[in-house]
């Protein structure tokens, strides 16, 4: 099997993770009283949308040669695993044993999907 589509899916997952981090950062930079419309003007929101767009483009290209039933779980799982780690690093969100186990199980599932697809 060609590794390029799988790499594209992981790159899409990374862009999804970055987009989520930027959205959280953009919203966190506003006062609690800020409305939803204020969010649209933050660099974090704009950056998040850009990275989501890149995510969609990379994923669409990967779908040229991967089954969506294989590609999407890899995208979602890899993005989830990266986001758990990034949110701990950037925002100090807790990363307890249960999250480690969850990330490990997701990664094992991704390996099974990637090899079986």
UniProtKB/Swiss-Prot annotation:
Record-annotated disulphide pairs: none
Transmembrane parts of this sequence: 3-23, 40-60, 66-86, 94-114
Record-linked InterPro entries: Small_drug/metabolite_transptr (IPR000390), Small_multidrug_res (IPR045324)
Gene3D superfamilies on file: 1.10.3730.20
GO cellular component: plasma membrane
Protein family (similarity comment): To E.coli and S.aureus ethidium bromide resistance proteins (ebr/QacC/EmrE/MvrC).
Entry protein name: Uncharacterized protein y4nH
Species for this entry: Sinorhizobium fredii (strain NBRC 101917 / NGR234)
Lineage: Bacteria, Pseudomonadati, Pseudomonadota, Alphaproteobacteria, Hyphomicrobiales
């Amino acid at each position: 099997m060609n590794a390029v589509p799988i790499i594209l899916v992981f790159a899409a997952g990374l862009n999804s993770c970055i987009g989520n981090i930027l959205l959280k950062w953009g919203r966190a930079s506003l006062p609690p009283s800020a409305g939803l419309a204020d969010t649209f003007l933050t660099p974090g929101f704009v950056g998040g949308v850009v990275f989501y767009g890149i995510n969609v483009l990379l994923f669409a290209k990967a779908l040229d040669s991967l089954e969506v039933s294989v590609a999407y779980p890899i995208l979602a799982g890899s993005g989830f695993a990266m986001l758990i780690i990034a949110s701990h690093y950037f925002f100090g969100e807790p990363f307890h044993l249960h999250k480690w186990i969850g990330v490990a199980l997701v990664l094992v599932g991704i390996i099974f999907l990637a090899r079986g697809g």
